[in-house]
């Protein structure tokens, strides 16, 4: 006699398959949202070019123009590949601010200051938003998973996951800032540059990995767009039946 208290092997296999599909979809969506490995590399390479050229030439203008030129080429390449404008130009603007700031101030360390301030501000934003009950990671990824803000009011498990992810991002970026700002104040530009390059990809990968862990254990997202389409379809069917 079959037991109705325990799931059958087929049901367990179906759940495992659905869970694997959900984790895979989460992984793909996360890497898409943050530009993928290529995006991480592209945000690091201009800084590497700047510090390498400055170490050899000791010329702020040559180093800054080279870094900015490379960033523009990478952005154009993304446009040719029909990537999103966000991924194509987000790095370009950051490098441009740093290049202009360094050349105007005459201090090569200022090439890195806009990015450092952005990182610190982002860290504070993640932590404050988590404390306020509106985790920034949920606001960023909600549209990616087609759930918008449904995670906050209708899916408490997702809210918990987004809160944990926001804390993870905030603390990791805060730790990164705690390393970089003392080097900016008391170190030289080569020390700051090489350490900043070294701290480019690993913290990002760790943050994305922890986000994936939290979301893969959370309930699946509620597709609000599918719900709206279903409601519109049902409304059209009712109208057709009433005629």
Describe the function of each predicted region.
Residues 85-96, 112-119:
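Cytoplasmic-side transmembrane-helix entry/capping segments in multi-pass membrane proteins
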Residues 47-55, 72-76, 99-103, 124-127, ...:
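Alpha-helical transmembrane segments of multipass membrane proteins
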Residues 80-84, 104-112, 189-190:
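Membrane-interface helix caps and helix-loop-helix hairpins in membrane proteins
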Residues 17-32, 45-56, 72-82, 161:
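Short juxtamembrane and helix-loop transition motifs at transmembrane-helix boundaries
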Residues 145-243:
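C-terminal membrane-adjacent module
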Residues 1-35, 232-233:
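Short, Lys/Arg-rich, polar N-terminal cytosolic tail immediately upstream
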Residues 109-160:
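Membrane-proximal helix-loop-helix units in multi-pass membrane proteins
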């Amino acid at each position: 006699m079959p037991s109705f208290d325990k799931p059958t092997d087929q049901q367990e296999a179906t759940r495992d398959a659905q869970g694997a599909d959900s984790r895979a979809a989460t992984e793909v969506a996360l890497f898409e949202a943050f530009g993928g490995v290529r995006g991480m590399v592209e945000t690091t390479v201009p800084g590497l070019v700047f510090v390498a050229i400055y170490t050899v030439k000791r010329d702020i203008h040559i180093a800054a123009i080279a870094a900015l030129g490379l960033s523009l080429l990478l952005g154009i390449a993304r446009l040719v590949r029909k990537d999103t404008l966000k991924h194509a130009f987000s790095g370009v603007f950051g490098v441009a601010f740093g290049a202009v700031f360094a050349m105007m101030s005459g201090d090569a360390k200022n090439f890195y200051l806009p990015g450092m301030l952005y990182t610190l501000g982002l860290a504070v934003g993640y932590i404050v938003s988590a404390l306020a009950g509106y985790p920034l990671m949920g606001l960023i990824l909600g549209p990616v998973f087609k759930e918008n803000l449904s995670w906050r009011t209708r899916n408490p498990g997702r809210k918990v996951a987004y809160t944990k992810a926001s804390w993870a991002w905030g603390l990791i970026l805060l730790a990164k800032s705690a390393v970089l700002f003392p080097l900016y104040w008391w170190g030289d530009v080569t020390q700051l540059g090489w350490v900043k390059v070294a701290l480019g990809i690993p913290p990002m990968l760790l943050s994305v990995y922890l986000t994936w862990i939290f979301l893969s254990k959370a309930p699946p997202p509620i597709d609000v767009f599918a719900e709206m389409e279903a409601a519109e379809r049902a409304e059209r069917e009712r109208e057709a039946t009433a005629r």
